[in-house]
Amino acid sequence: NADVACCVADILLQAENVIGNVQAEVVITGSAGLGLSERLGLPFVQEVIAVSNFVKSSKMEINTLIDIGGEDAKIIFFDKGQMPLMRMNGNCAGGTGAFIDQMAVVLGVAVEELDALAQRAEHIYAIASRCGVFAKTDVQILVAKAVSKQDIAASIFNAIALQVISSLSKGLPIKPKILLCGGPLTYIKSLRQAFERQLHLSETDLLCLEYSNLIPAMGCIYSQTQQSFVTSLSEFAQRLKSANLSTTCQSQSGPQPIFSSRGELL
């Protein structure tokens, strides 16, 4: 699903089959949507702003939000009367969904299997999650020592929790109630439990909504933009596919090579 435009277009067409070809106001958010917004001239809301607006509008007593995405992780601290304070890791795969993907490959299992394996773990081992390279080495050592995949899977999630807490809190207290956000925390129970252990909290202190992976999108509803774009589902789906086709054609033609011949290169 790396083809963002076509993936969104397909989802819109599926939605059309359920709710009809309704009119909708379009707002884009998320790192993957920034380029799409610029190409199509659509309103864009920064993800942290969308998330913050969702929390404020929900009337939930949220003090902290922990978000683990595919390529970054962030913690947002909420304090009444103050601007939300964000800490983000976007420079390394450590503590992100990409890190989970890497570790699943090392273990030779599907990402979906890691959670079930971790639920049957008996021991937690130290794994360096700050860097995927070091973590891979640690996991390979555990495999060589015949440590069970169950224990390794649980240790991977424990390492992610440690990485996010230690690198992003930066001395600030992570106070409950904590809202969990992003695909990994929404779908992986063992990862949520790892945060409970590391923060010494109960399950009720961490709030995971049914659609926690869509919190930024829902936050766009409460975010004001300078421009408005209203269209039908089918029209927008077609626009996405057309924009994606033109971009593909451009990328295939590409820029001119620096060296026109092997002789110039040598």
What is each model feature region?
Residues 1, 16-49, 58, 77, ...:
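Short beta-strand-loop/turn "lid" adjacent to the catalytic site in phosphate-handling enzymes
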Residues 1-8, 13, 84-92:
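Short glycine-rich, Thr/Ser-proximal phosphate-binding strand/loop in the N-terminal lobe
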Residues 32, 169-198, 209-213:
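Glycine-rich phosphate-binding loops at beta-strand->alpha-helix junctions
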Residues 44-48, 195-218:
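Conserved phosphate-binding/catalytic loops in two-lobed NTP-binding clefts
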Residues 46-107:
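Glycine-rich phosphate-binding loop of actin/hexokinase-like ATP-binding domains
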Residues 74, 223-266:
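Acidic, glycine/GT-rich loop-and beta-edge segments that sit at the periphery of enzyme/chaperone cores
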Residues 82-123, 213, 219-228:
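Glycine-rich phosphate-binding loop plus the immediately following alpha-helix
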Residues 135-170:
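Adenine-nucleotide phosphate-binding core of ATP-dependent small-molecule kinases
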